[in-house]
Swiss-Prot record:
Belongs to the VMA21 family. Residues 35-38 are lumenal. It holds the Pfam family VMA21. The chain crosses the membrane at residues 14-34, 39-59. A motif (Prevents secretion from ER) lies at residues 74-77. It is found in: Endoplasmic reticulum membrane; Endoplasmic reticulum-Golgi intermediate compartment membrane; Cytoplasmic vesicle, COPII-coated vesicle membrane. Functions with VOA1 in assembly of the integral membrane sector (also called V0 sector) of the V-ATPase in the endoplasmic reticulum. Escorts the assembled V0 sector in COPII vesicles. Also required for normal packaging of the SNARE BOS1 and possibly the ER to Golgi transport receptor ERV29. It comes from Saccharomyces cerevisiae (strain ATCC 204508 / S288c). This is Vacuolar ATPase assembly integral membrane protein VMA21.
Length: 77
């Protein structure tokens, strides 16, 4: 029993998955070039992972509210 998932949802999920992997690692190594302290580099990498997660949640909520607005407009017609 397969569920049809919209392609936009899959694309968005893949984008944020890649960002969750790449951005913290990239942040760690870029900051490591400026300071030898791994605590700072690791902390900023963890912060970047949290930023990606928060942005994903905000995008998901906006998408959900847009769907409700579209459904509301269809019912009024």
């Amino acid at each position: 029993m397969a569920v049809d998932v919209p392609r936009a949802v899959i694309n968005k999920l893949m984008l944020f998955t890649a960002a969750m992997v790449v951005l913290p690692v990239l942040t760690f190594f870029i900051i490591q070039q400026f300071t030898p302290n791994t605590l700072i580099s690791g902390g900023l990498a963890a912060a970047m992972a949290n930023v990606v997660l928060i942005v994903y949640i905000v995008v998901a909520f906006r998408e959900d509210t847009e769907d409700h607005k579209v459904d509301g407009n269809k019912k009024e017609d």
